[in-house]
């Protein structure tokens, strides 16, 4: 199985290069998001709002059929769905009411994605939202699994919590979270309708895959991708950071923190001291 997968990997990697170089891809509209759009954090969104990360996602299909239906959620290359949003999500001009949760770090529309080669949002076979499209494998005893939380109206949260990588490795575990909001959600200033949140991200690829990819794709080559996707070192770029995107898939700048009253008092005291010192220096000497 490993030898076959290695062969498939080589073929898929070659195809990925062809996709990048093909005229079709050249005609597609691809927007690159700079790493500076990410904000240091180190927390999940659910750490901030409380309530946990939700229930384990049980796979309903995917490449490794032996893991389909396992109540533990442990699997390799599986997906679950379709799952209803409970609202309408407009994505690349199309309205969606349901999605597929894919073990390999993304959600998709219309069909599940079991591909383990992260061709990125530009090469995905279906419309995709990808906080970390990579070769996730949660079969290792030390690995966490994919969770879904949908108890908040107009909000869907998926968490790949401390997940391992192929082939059932659990010596390094990535932790990342996706937040999707419907039109009925009152979005606070400084937040958006889609959020990517990352904790520790110590692994980025496997022996039979390539570095992960981050962003959005419409399944036809048009995409919004984070700079460095499919390039070694991307895991360090996203680790312990987060980013919100608005309805146009543009990054939302974070709101600058408002100084606390005590901070204001210290600032005013400092300004008063500087003003007094300035007046003292400008005061003419009476001894002359």
What are these regions (language model features)?
Residues 29-256:
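Extracytoplasmic Ser/Thr/Pro-rich, glycosylation-prone low-complexity segments
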Residues 8, 13, 22-30, 249-268:
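Short, threonine-centered small-residue motifs that mark membrane-proximal processing/anchoring sites
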Residues 2-11, 283-284:
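Bacterial Sec-dependent N-terminal signal peptides
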Residues 275-288:
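C-terminal membrane-anchoring or membrane-association module
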Residues 17-25, 272-275:
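Hydrophobic h-region of N-terminal signal peptides that target proteins for export
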């Amino acid at each position: 199985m490993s030898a076959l997968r290695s062969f498939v990997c080589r073929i898929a990697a070659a195809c990925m290069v062809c996709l990048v170089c093909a005229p079709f891809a050249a005609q597609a509209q691809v927007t690159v998001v700079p790493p500076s759009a990410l904000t240091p954090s180190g927390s999940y969104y659910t750490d901030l709002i409380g309530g946990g990360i939700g229930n384990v996602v049980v796979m309903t299909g995917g490449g490794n059929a032996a893991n389909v239906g396992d109540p533990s959620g442990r699997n390799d290359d599986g997906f679950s769905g379709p799952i209803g949003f409970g609202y309408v999500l407009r994505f690349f001009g199309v309205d969606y009411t349901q999605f597929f949760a894919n073990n390999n770090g993304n959600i998709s529309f219309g069909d599940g994605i079991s591909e383990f080669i992260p061709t990125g949002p530009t090469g995905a076979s279906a419309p995709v939202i990808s906080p970390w499209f990579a070769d996730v494998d949660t079969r290792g005893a030390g690995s966490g699994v994919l969770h879904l939380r949908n108890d908040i109206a107009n909000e869907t949260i998926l968490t790949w919590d401390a997940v391992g990588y192929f082939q059932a490795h659990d010596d390094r575990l990535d932790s990342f979270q996706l937040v999707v909001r419907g039109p009925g959600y009152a979005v606070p200033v400084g937040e958006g309708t889609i959020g990517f949140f990352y904790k520790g991200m110590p692994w980025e690829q496997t022996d039979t895959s390539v570095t992960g990819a981050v962003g959005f794709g419409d399944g036809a080559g048009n995409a919004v991708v984070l700079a460095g996707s499919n390039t070694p070192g991307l895991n360090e770029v996203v680790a312990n950071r987060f980013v919100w995107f608005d309805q146009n898939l543009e990054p939302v700048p974070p709101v600058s923190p408002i100084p606390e009253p005590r901070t204001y008092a210290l600032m005013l005291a400092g300004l008063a001291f500087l003003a007094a010192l300035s007046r003292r220096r400008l005061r003419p000497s009476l001894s002359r």
